[in-house]
Amino acid sequence: MARRRRFLSNQGVYHVYNRAEQGAAIFASDGAKRLFVEALFRVVELCGWELFAFAVMSNHFHLLLSTPRGNLDVGMHVLQSDFANKHKAFRGSIGHVFQSRYRADHCASGPLAAARMDYVHLNPVRAGLVSMQQLCQYPWTSYQSLRHPGSRGRLAIGAGLELLHGICDTPAGWDAYELRLRSVLTTDQRSLTETELFESFVARRRGALSEAKGADLRVNRSRAELVADEMARWEEILTEVLKAEGVTREALVGRPPSDAVKVGVAIKVRQRCPAYSSWLTERLRMGSPDYARQLMARFKGSGRSIGGV
């Protein structure tokens, strides 16, 4: 079956979600959840996303975000590849980590997006992991940061409250949002396993967004053009890094893939943008993407300074 065409936009809100291959508990440990969240916030920074809400369960995740640069595909590729590669390296496993590329529902920043924000935050409660009273202490959703603005970093939960719910990001607003979540729970008190919760959501959301994908959310640019824009930024950053290092692309071509300058340049580029490993290996002649990732990991793990390579 042909893959359904993915809709990309730099407007509106995306609810992004995915589950592990065969429902495996890839996020069972706090360490695995932490690894995913760290990768998520790195992508949020590099891609310029606004992350309104997230939840990481044992076998799936939910994200609610906007993409001002229209680069959802790029960011999700980097996020899932980064986590999957580290997960497989730690486990010594092979094969797929996630059951699909990812799923994404797109809508305007209105009631539907607000309901999705509620759904994301209530996932741990509906799965029976915590009670509503304990939700603020569950570390793997954005709700924990609701009453702690100083700990949010690049999390835009406050902007989400104001944009989607019309609730001020103040103590009074936080109280109002908690009351809203309690009210939502009152209308749906089903207790489901994580797998049942995910499958139930997927079944209920089919077709629910058909009226939300109006022409007002589309941009006069194709998916290919949006991705090309993102890659043009990578080219600019690569040029800047090479200039700062005092080396040209031509000078690097004849050097071996493991050359310290090549590896250092690749790391610096990845620190500033979500460039694909395949893109870097092609530009810097670093062999295969897997080999390039190994070289960068080995270089960073050695404790060597990246500056002045």
Cite the ranges covered by each PLM segment.
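Short Pro-Cys-Gly-centered "Cys-loop" motif that presents a nucleophilic cysteine in a tight turn
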Residues: 1-58, 66-309
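Conserved N-terminal diphosphate/IPP-binding helix and adjacent helical/loop segment
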Residues: 63
